[in-house]
Amino acid sequence: MKDPADATAATATMDPDAPSRFAVWASAIAWPLASFAALLAAWEWLVPLAQIPEYILPVPSAFFDRLWTDRALITEHTLITAKEIVLGFLMAAVVSIPLGYVIVSVKILEKAVYPVIVFFQLVPKIAIAPLFVVWFGFGLFPKVLLTFLLCFFPTLVASMTGFRALDERVLYLTRSMGMTGWQTFRLVRVPAALTYIFSGLKVSAVFAATGAIVGEFVGAHAGLGYLLLRGTSFLDMPLIFACLVALSFVGILFSYLVDGLEVLLMPWQRKT
């Protein structure tokens, strides 16, 4: 005889009125898109009404037109900034997550190394950005390094918190089962810490764009930060806002990629 609970679940699954995954996704983005469209419409209407000149605040149609007209130029510089963001973020993740585990596992390191890391984190990154230009020039590496430094600390702290949060009784159980250190790390410690790690990665994803743009402000021959400075020099407000739209698109896309990676690596937390 079929279990009533299974029958109920099957009925719910086959219910034609149950919302599909696409419908849920569409509903999730419908309201933000509607709010954004309403904001742009109000902006387009209010700026001419208030007689604000274009060199102060352009209407959305002006900078979207500029975004289309100069799409080749803006795309070229956007890809450069995106490359800096991705490389700096990945470097921070590759270094900070294992380091967080090592610091938590070796208590003397937590007492000796972590305070030094905190000290260097307190140094404003924008203050040392000119030094990177002097030391490493105007190429890609200074921007990637600055992005790395901004992403490193949030990911490290989140990783340490996640590795430290594992119940000691779970570790006793793994030892009693004869699991090796590598098996415990791969099958127990990392999955248990992933929630914390991704919290840090999401914060770092926001800081990554800031690091790349600040690095380009200080010294660069390409990138959205360079275009922003060029637009500011000539009071080219449509170009400035077009660059901001492109930068926002990169940030949103990168944030969604991190969310997608979280869903891929943590399917048990996927919302139904």
How would you label these PLM feature ranges?
Residues 134-135, 163, 210-247, 266-272:
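Glycine-rich helix-loop "coupling/hinge" segments at transmembrane-helix boundaries
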Residues 16-25, 48-93:
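Periplasmic/extracellular loop-to-transmembrane helix junction in inner-membrane transport proteins
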Residues 88-117:
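Transmembrane-helix boundary motif in ABC transporter permease subunits
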Residues 117-154, 161-162:
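Generic hydrophobic transmembrane alpha-helix motif, especially the helices
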Residues 107, 195, 241-272:
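C-terminal transmembrane helix and the adjacent membrane-cytosol boundary/short C-terminal tail
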Residues 145-149, 182-215, 242, 246-247, ...:
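Transmembrane alpha-helices
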Residues 155-203, 224, 228:
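Short cytoplasmic-facing helical segments at TM-TM junctions of multi-pass membrane proteins
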Residues 1-35, 256-272:
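Transmembrane alpha-helical segments of polytopic membrane transport and secretion proteins
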